[in-house]
Amino acid sequence: MKHLFLVALSIITIASYSQKPKIFELKSPDNKTTLIISAGEQIRWAAEQDGQPVISPSAISITLENEILGRNVKITSSGEEKIARSFKAINYIKETVKDECNQLTLEFTGEWGLIFRVYDNAVAYRFFTKRKDSLIIQKEESNFNFPADEKLFAPIQWDYRDGKNFNSSFEALYHEIRCSQFPKDSLAFLPLLADAGGDRKVLITEADLEDYPGMYLNLNSTGQGLQGVWAPYPLKSRIFHINYVPYERANYIARVSGTRVFPWRVAVISRSDKELLNCDIVQVLASDQRIGDDYSWVKPGQAAWDWWNNWNISGVDFKAGINTKTYQYYIDFAAENKIPYIVMDEGWSDDLDLTKRIPDSVLNLQAVLDYAKQKNVGVFLWATWYAVSRQMDEVFPLYAKMGVKGFKIDFFDRDDQVVVASTYAIAKKAAENKLMVDYHGIYKPTGLQRTWPNVVSYEGVKGLENFKWANEDQPRYTASIPFIRMLAGPMDYTPGAMRNATAQDYRPVNGNPMSKGTRCEQLAEYVIFFTPFQMLSDNPTTYRREKESLDFITRIPTTFDETVPLESKVGEWAALARRKGGSWWVGALGDLQPKDIVIDLSFLPAGEYNGEFFYDGVNADRKGTDYRRETVTVRSGEKLKVHLAPGGGFAGRISPTAASMLQNRIDDFVIIAVSDLEPITVNR
């Protein structure tokens, strides 16, 4: 098969161009994934795994004002390198990340080149230039051709606020369509997943996106392939409600430095769906951290959030709303339950001017911050991107001095070069003031959270807020995003609904919203949906009535030392286990079809463990809040039989028993024995 694939690539290239191309073949460390590059009058790349084509020959190039990088190329040098390294991850799903691949660097006349990498589970390439003067990037060509008309999970957007479909909140259900059925008038944002047949999947995304527009995809001329599309550079913009929307764009996509690297174009190739739940490729390809040696002030954790529950607390002697007493109530709730943060969402200030706060007689922000400090609770403030991008030099020092710990910055709603560059500038300025940031209304993560670890989360997901106004198949979506969107990085889905309804009973309600699905599905989201900054979205009054669920939620960490994917299927159910210290957390959630799954505890080291498990109740198909809590003793290798109700879930905590912990200590104990006159160290 491989021989035929190489021949096909050569035939396509030679038939199209008179110049005989140079063919390069680069293999993964395990020799099972191959990247094939053809460089001549055009540059094409293709990929295969286990001898099966996964990406057919696909052309790539960058068009400048007077030349095309990728046409009629002349190679000046080529070199291969084996990369085998690891790094300590900051606030991630595991403690250490491995970067193991083979790399090919090609340099061409004209002071530019390409870097290709092959991992066991991914292929990637990026352009680079070494020129003195700045460059105008008129367009880029990036194709992903498939060997067949494959089924896609495509997050397609239709948003014409700017007249050109380049404004987006980056929230969309997945259109499960064949590639040839891709709507011609639309774009898909990343990540996008293709089913390559059997159990194999191909996920397309990008990494290390800096000072350059983000990539969208649409159908290319082959009819069974996708091509990159980029937002043109914005020249003029205007306020549209609280967005800043371009109304005039240039005929180019970016103006960049002449010496730079461009974003990685990435295709993740998995042999099973569960592999997608534990893929580090975006983290690996991102630029290393720039925050400095001391980032101890970047402290992940959970937050009590106001906006989703509409400030609807009850049983108090004051009027609930955006006022001092309400936020002191949220702070009390957070302190009682060891929740480290609260988020003060929209309403504390003018949306477009963060120096204009509502009167102290209504909301005394300094009093709230002082009260929070006394209770050892941090405060995040909501703000629009428009306001922050214009006022950060003034307001970041101001609010940091008052005691604010971070900002939730919303309504970017674009990923053109201007906005992408601003995400780095905001993160840097925030770090200078020891502020964390949570980006909302924004494109997918591409590694900025590694470069600037004070970026503690991203939205870029159709989260729980949609239950306030939409009746959609959210459970199938939540059973899909762990494999697709979450592969890109942290995901601020904002779980935690305590009003849980079946599909038959569900209805959108703004003031007292509910989730479609079961209580256990909400609990499972805290284990499965990774974000260092995790919301508790329902209101404190409701949580206090649901103390058993609350106590479980607030014990779940937001960063982990190890992640183990369990048997899963995209769009049907997702299951995984995560370890923090000596304790394991396990979760599973499903679509609207009831199903029986098995949770294999073979990931546990040998020993005896205490298990606390939450199962869908026997009547969860009739009443979404029905659940069963069970405490049992389990051992490694046991298999838990789990029934998922429609929109159901399962969640649990597994920790070593006292006897097991004692045995581990004995096993690790070092005995000093004496033999004649020489000490002997015996490890047991």
Positions of PLM-derived features:
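N-terminal accessory beta-strand-rich subdomains and adjacent acidic, glycine-rich linkers
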Residues: 21-284, 290
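Bacterial Sec-dependent N-terminal signal peptides
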Residues: 1-22
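Aromatic- and carboxylate-enriched substrate-binding clefts and catalytic-loop regions
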Residues: 345-518
